[in-house]
């Protein structure tokens, strides 16, 4: 039992700390998502492990021969888990309990605020996205958000932008990326949609025909 007022760990460390394959995967995730250390990977993995454990218990209850599937408390628990994961965009709206077992750590890391700031085109790199957040330049629904690891719901994702008095609100700011991903309230275009459109326009055309063969000597 922890002391009152003392924060307990919200994650589990690996049981076998020196597994080469797992360590290599963790390093890749730290680099890809601009994480501060492996602890942030372990937090995401622990969260995923918790949901998968609950999903297995529910599936085991169904497999135990209960007629009519999930009922009562089990049905309510199943709906709550699915509703939360759908709300945060971790699974699709038509997903079921079985789909939770196929989730990966990356599915959790993709919903972090730091990742979403990069995906929406508000920062050039994932490291810059973290810097903008910790320095108070990013807001959700107009409220400053300074925690890079907070999970962002699909609804809040549409309202991520620069904080009200941040210098980055100025489009000529040297650290601000080229803004083609601005939220257009009148047309309903989101930052994400605009960013995806920009990526499609900048995709280089495929070269056809291959390399031309040189003719033989005469």
From Swiss-Prot:
Residues 111-175 form the S4 RNA-binding domain. HAMAP family: Ribosomal_uS4_A. GO terms for biological process: ribosomal small subunit biogenesis; translation. InterPro entries: Ribosomal_uS4, Ribosomal_uS4_arc, Ribosomal_uS4_CS, Ribosomal_uS4_euk/arc, Ribosomal_uS4_N, S4_RNA-bd, S4_RNA-bd_sf. Keywords: Ribonucleoprotein, Ribosomal protein, RNA-binding, rRNA-binding. One of its GO terms (cellular component) is small ribosomal subunit. One of the primary rRNA binding proteins, it binds directly to 16S rRNA where it nucleates assembly of the body of the 30S subunit. With S5 and S12 plays an important role in translational accuracy. Residues 198-209 have a biased composition (Basic and acidic residues). PANTHER family: 30S 40S RIBOSOMAL PROTEIN (PTHR11831), 40S RIBOSOMAL PROTEIN S9 (PTHR11831:SF5). Belongs to the universal ribosomal protein uS4 family. NCBIfam families: PRK04051.1 (NF003139), uS4_arch (TIGR01018). Part of the 30S ribosomal subunit. Contacts protein S5. The interaction surface between S4 and S5 is involved in control of translational fidelity. This is Small ribosomal subunit protein uS4. One of its GO terms (molecular function) is rRNA binding. Residues 192-218 are annotated as: Disordered.
């Amino acid at each position: 039992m922890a002391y009152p007022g003392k924060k307990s760990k919200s994650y589990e460390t690996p049981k076998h700390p020196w597994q080469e394959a797992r360590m290599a995967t963790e390093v890749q995730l730290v680099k890809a998502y601009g994480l501060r250390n492996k602890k942030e990977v372990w937090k995401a993995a622990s969260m995923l492990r918790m949901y998968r454990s609950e999903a297995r218990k529910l599936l085991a209850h169904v497999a135990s021969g209960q007629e009519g599937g999930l009922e009562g408390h089990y049905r309510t628990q199943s709906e709550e888990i699915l509703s939360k994961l759908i709300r945060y965009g971790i699974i699709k709206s038509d997903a079921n309990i079985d789909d939770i077992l196929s989730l990966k750590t990356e599915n959790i890391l993709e919903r972090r605020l730091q990742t979403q700031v990069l995906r929406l085109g508000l920062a050039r790199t994932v490291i810059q996205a973290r810097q903008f957040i910790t320095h108070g330049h990013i807001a959700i629904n107009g409220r400053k958000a300074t925690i890079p690891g907070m999970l962002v719901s699909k609804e809040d994702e549409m309202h991520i932008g620069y904080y009200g008095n941040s210098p980055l609100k100025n489009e000529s700011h040297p650290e601000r990326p080229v803004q083609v991903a601005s939220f257009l309230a009148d047309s309903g275009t989101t930052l994400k949609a605009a960013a995806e459109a920009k990526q499609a326009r900048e995709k280089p055309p495929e070269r056809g025909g291959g390399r031309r063969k040189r003719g033989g000597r005469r």
